[in-house]
From Swiss-Prot:
The keyword Ribonucleoprotein applies. GO terms for biological process: negative regulation of translation; translation. One of its GO terms (cellular component) is cytosolic large ribosomal subunit. Part of the 50S ribosomal subunit. This is Large ribosomal subunit protein uL13. This protein is one of the early assembly proteins of the 50S ribosomal subunit, although it is not seen to bind rRNA by itself. It is important during the early stages of 50S assembly. Disulfide bonds: none annotated. Belongs to the universal ribosomal protein uL13 family. One of its GO terms (molecular function) is mRNA binding.
Length: 144
């Protein structure tokens, strides 16, 4: 008996809605990354993008536990000497909560072409409204 290997044309994609309000950022991001990769499907193939689309709403209400709001930093470097810029997550979540969530998920996905394809299937919204009602997304209850 041969192992089943999914082909990109055969993959059926579903749409899911995840409400991130009051839930820890890392826990929500890890489950979203798993769905984007397709690890929740029995036909998971590591070298094929077989994941589903995920819509994350209420990104501005995501929680960070402990002192992470002040101690955790978003770091950017300009590649010039002394070009490191650090921003505390309190400021990042206040200005661009979508970016903070996308960064958390992006770092959990594979690095390379496949990871960039998977990240395109992630739609993050600041509030409770989104533009994807036509796709009839299912509400996804997270494990924790």
């Amino acid at each position: 008996m041969k192992s089943y290997i999914a082909k990109a044309q055969e993959v059926e994609r579903k749409w899911y809605v995840v409400d991130a309000a009051g839930k820890p950022l890392g826990r929500v991001a890890s489950q979203v990354a798993s769905i984007l990769r397709g690890k929740n499907k029995p036909t998971f193939t590591p070298n094929v993008d077989c994941g589903d689309f995920v819509i994350v709403i209420n990104a501005e209400e995501v929680a960070l536990t402990g002192k992470k709001l002040d101690q955790k930093m978003l770091r950017k470097h300009s590649f010039y000497p002394g070009g490191l810029k650090e921003t505390p997550y309190r400021e990042v979540l206040a200005k661009k909560p979508e970016f903070a969530f996308e960064e958390a998920v992006r770092r959990m996905l594979p690095k390379g072409v496949l990871g960039r394809q998977m990240l395109k299937k992630l739609k993050v919204y600041r509030g409770a409204e989104h533009d994807h009602a036509a796709q009839k997304p299912e509400v996804l209850e997270l494990k924790y």
